[in-house]
């Protein structure tokens, strides 16, 4: 049936900020849906609160709203834009929940908006655990034994029937939030209470354990005529009990017999028919008991998901694009498969002749207090995917793509001859953590048999055999040495995925020696195309991966090419913002007539969509892999400054190998990152830095620290995201840090800076062109004080409290720095501003990054100036004048960026902010005043507005004076105040009526008791020094558990309290309307 003609305007809801469980895969699906529907002539309206996405670019939809994804806000957009239909399946759990809210509150009916892609009943049946279970019984499919509970008492009754261990799954949450595995009653009660609190409908499923079973997923697409295809089968290497987002997964499934595969295929299609997913993609998860073959249905997602992004990238079949077209009436046989150049219809099931492995990326190093065991609640922050002709090849490529410093299945560091360490090894095999794969390899080194490892880990023996073979090959290499390797043996090693760097490690040589040998022996990779049909039809799409075979399918052109190196897997400190910049570079340079080549290995992103660039190499971002691609393609320029630290780390080595790195030179990048060289430059320019020094030994650090004075910010050199950075208040603190952190520094020195207390931090983004002209992109004033990592601080553009004179001073300093560093392209500079008693400001330069920064997308959305595109053109030789962009744009409205944190997912983590970055994503709010914009950003970040009740205040001495006006504003709004003794005395002295409450150490009833009893609605708590931070940890943690809004900085508290009156008020503006104001 052809497309519907009764629909004109379609509303798409995005997924909001990047959080654990919902990352940039929804930017990829949403961007695809926008493109597909506009190409069909529909008017598209988009709402998403995340400014770092490609889908919120003003040219992606006819009207783009960067607004909170809340049904009341979306209702305002519906009233204004009058859409005919709403497509809720492209924005993950967030969009589905919002669509259900709109339906339940009668909004869709009131405005005559039709849900397309998934009907309300289908969403309800798939997401409501009890309805789903009943539906499965009706079609003769089994689910694990389970019942739904809405209270702890009921949950305990069900638990008695299903026994321990028990799986707990809250309804309508994302990435298993609030769920877990309980092995005893105490754990069970804790997880149930948390799950009931975090489920929006306050219900949980209490389920029998299927731990250790094999887990499979089917990606299914169905159209309105009931045509169904399986796009891809996915097998989890980790057995049931680990969330599929945290599992290593492999496509296609490797250990299913044909009969079992057909059985799962039939079952998954039956599930879609029963649930009523009429059009679009869904993901169905199964568990199989390896002993009996019993099959159970675990769950299904009636929308595109993380797995469908993986399946799309693994097969080249664009699920989201096809799903969007099916939602408007097309059938699969009417749509063409673009990868085969339209030679096959979309109803032709993809088949692949290679193996794809996905490995998740974790961030436990950022959260040492978090429980690092993997369960049914997702904890990974990103993922990497690799392709190879064998499982071993794709596994080892994925390992080096993870960028955790490992170049293969390296030993974990256990002493395998020690009994104590073998106990640790067995525990690590049994209780999965982020590194289990490496412990499996260690088990084989320790002489374990496959059966022994299986008995502990329940990883299928087929996978274990492959890992054992890799370890055996390593052992032979260690014995024989590099000299014994001939061409045939080297080719065999490369075919099972060994990197040059790993071969060098095992043979005691270096990577250059191995590469030289490989060149002499003429062992080079070839590139194969992803074509969705296992080579049955020719493909014009250049979507490539490397392997060691005979025939190369790369067929490079002789056009002028620019290669863009992506950012690799998402992690804290390096996320979607960098992918956004890479995509913009590809789009701009393609428009300029260059052939664009993207190199990346992150399956979630828009950059790895095969039609973002002319040629896509799905490869790890290591020196070896990049050099091989350069050798085939011969680009005229390679861009390293857009993918964050990942490609920057390669800049010098690429240049040394004759690769044309364009933009700011690796020499200038090094000058900005090398502390001592940079300090000399700052002194030459007559700019001011906080007193600082560099220490190469622990003793030297303690001596120099006495000269600078405490408090200090200490960190290793060369880091991104503030890794291992800390504020220390005493010599004892510094001694402990130097003991622990010098390990991080790999013989590179420790940096000490005087910490500027109560300073305002400012970020400035600029572009410099080849002639040294500079365009100020934006000046952003941070809301949290200096000392909170810039990626974790909210910020406002334009600044809300800085004087015009200070802002002009910042602009002057930035221009001088850019010119002195010979920057071509983007540069980000951070300043701290301290006020003197006479009201004048002192400006301190904190750091300069001559690369894309994480604020680029936010600034671009706020000002309407596409910084990443303009800067990419500067790198290829165009001036700012030639691009007609020479004036800074300062909007008349305010835009506020707010950071989003993963604390709810990571039990036991202290949510206090500091110099180490811990946020996973961001949202943006726009308003006519700073307070209104801040209120909108808080709504978008789902930060509850405290309603009048009792506010708890406990602040460090230097903050007492500054907290007074905030407390007075709270009292004026009808809040009561409780405070700890010191703060209580200060408030009483200043005429504020309040009650005193015990600190936790002072006896009961104390403040945590009040929080647990629901008596506190808002918390202001600032601390300094390790002891005070540790003492007040339980306050912040309980606030998080009980969803009490809290502020850990005075500036944050002031902004929040002043914004309360603007919550839920004001009109909505599309980006197009806002940007039109700027052009006047």
Swiss-Prot record:
Any one GO CC term of the record: cytoplasm
Matching InterPro entries: ATP-grasp, CarbamoylP_synth_lsu, CarbamoylP_synth_lsu_oligo, CarbamoylP_synth_lsu_oligo_sf, CbamoylP_synth_lsu-like_ATP-bd, CbamoylP_synth_lsu_CPSase_dom, MGS-like_dom, MGS-like_dom_sf
Binding site for Mn(2+) 1: 285, 299
UniProt-annotated binding residues for Mg(2+) 3: 830, 847
Known cofactor(s): Mg(2+); Mn(2+)
Pathway it works in: Amino-acid biosynthesis; L-arginine biosynthesis; carbamoyl phosphate from bicarbonate: step 1/1; Pyrimidine metabolism; UMP biosynthesis via de novo pathway; (S)-dihydroorotate from bicarbonate: step 1/3
Positions contributing to Mg(2+) 4 binding: 847, 849
Gene3D superfamilies in UniProt: 3.40.50.20, ATP-grasp fold, B domain, Carbamoyl-phosphate synthetase, large subunit oligomerisation domain, Methylglyoxal synthase-like domain
Residues reported to bind Mg(2+) 1: 285, 299
GO BP term, example: L-arginine biosynthetic process
Chain sites annotated for binding ATP 1: 129, 169, 175-176, 208, 210, 215, 241-243, 285, 299
EC class name: ligase
Location of region: Carboxyphosphate synthetic domain: 1-403
Reactions it catalyzes: hydrogencarbonate + L-glutamine + 2 ATP + H2O = carbamoyl phosphate + L-glutamate + 2 ADP + phosphate + 2 H(+)
Residues given in the record as ATP 2 binding sites: 715, 754, 756, 761, 787-790, 830, 847
Region Allosteric domain, residue ranges: 943-1080
Binding site residues for Mn(2+) 4: 847, 849
Residue span of region Oligomerization domain: 404-554
Assembly and interaction partners: Composed of two chains; the small (or glutamine) chain promotes the hydrolysis of glutamine to ammonia, which is used by the large (or ammonia) chain to synthesize carbamoyl phosphate. Tetramer of heterodimers (alpha,beta)4.
Task performed by this protein: Large subunit of the glutamine-dependent carbamoyl phosphate synthetase (CPSase). CPSase catalyzes the formation of carbamoyl phosphate from the ammonia moiety of glutamine, carbonate, and phosphate donated by ATP, constituting the first step of 2 biosynthetic pathways, one leading to arginine and/or urea and the other to pyrimidine nucleotides.
The record's note on its domains: The large subunit is composed of 2 ATP-grasp domains that are involved in binding the 2 ATP molecules needed for carbamoyl phosphate synthesis. The N-terminal ATP-grasp domain (referred to as the carboxyphosphate synthetic component) catalyzes the ATP-dependent phosphorylation of hydrogencarbonate to carboxyphosphate and the subsequent nucleophilic attack by ammonia to form a carbamate intermediate.
UniProt name for this protein: Carbamoyl phosphate synthase large chain
